[in-house]
Amino acid sequence: FQGKKLYRIMSELWKYDWINPAKSSPIILGDEHPIDIYYITDEEGTKESGNSLTKGGKWLWFKPELISNLLSIRGSFLNWYTRDTGSVSCAPNGGIHFGVNDLGLITVYAKDVGYLPEWQQQIWVGFNIAPEGGISKELHAAQVKAEPASTLAPEAFIERAINEINEEAKKQLNIRFFRGHHSIGEIIKSVNRFRAIDEKGLFSLAKDIARIIVDDIDIESVQKIAVPPKNIKWGSLKTIENLLAIKIHSEDARKILSPIVGVYELRHGDAHLPSSDIENSFGLIQINRSLPYVTQGYQMIYACVDNLYVILRILKKWDTK
């Protein structure tokens, strides 16, 4: 061999460290892990630990912001059982049965929260408040009386209504009502009343509802049936209004679309619009402005979903005289 001589040195180092045992071993020995988290359980501000909640018999109240915070975590979900009850979790498994009371607050059976892992309880406790407004009537009916309400949450029907309208428009008129933009599915998942924790949240909710309904209307396709006059340009809502006016009175068609028009106008509500214009838009949706924001958010979603189903019924009867 020629060139510089190289050397390779190999060695090993062994080191022994003694690890003293912890006071408890929840993973290896299955010891109970004390949860150092405390919840307000009554009007006087009494606090109880997460472990003590598993004894049952109590209820907890949370700010509505809790739901959006949980849903911001990967693997989370929100399912609806009735108008004011559902299941929510920040993890793929499980789910806490919750209810919404008359003040728009979240109420939960304390025992259910007590069984959550510590990392999840750390999220929940951050939104815990003293009891106010009573237990959700529908949650109490389901968990105490075993008589679940027969009501429905509009959030659970947004995507279904859109899909059924598209199917019926294709069947009856051979047109595509909605374009089905690839982002619509994700936006629909984010549409829920808990976005409306304040006026800004209400406007943000309106913006997303407008995106999945108004902005996604396939104007070109619908105008194959509702043809605008020469040199006249119709927007999305005017096109749908004139489509409906083929089968019903034009004034009725305008009334059907009024809530969706109101939502479309509110999408710019945070852009310093005159307060009179904003209130007129809320009036079109028939939102009671004296109610909690969460309830106003519910009314907004309900009005739009209800009118989508009115449009669907008209399409289904298109060929009938």
Residue ranges and their predicted role:
Residues 1-89, 95-97, 105-262, 298-321:
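Amphipathic alpha-helical interface elements
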Residues 102, 112, 274:
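A broadly conserved detector of short glycine/acidic/proline-rich loop/turn motifs that flank catalytic sites
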Residues 231-232, 282, 289-292:
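Short, low-complexity, polar/charged sequence segments that are solvent-exposed and flexible
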Residues 254-283:
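Histidine-centered, metal-coordinating catalytic motifs and their short helical/loop contexts
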Residues 278-286, 316-320:
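Structured alpha-helical bundle/scaffold domains in large eukaryotic membrane-trafficking regulators
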Residues 286-303:
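Short secondary-structure subsegments characteristic of cysteine-rich extracellular domains
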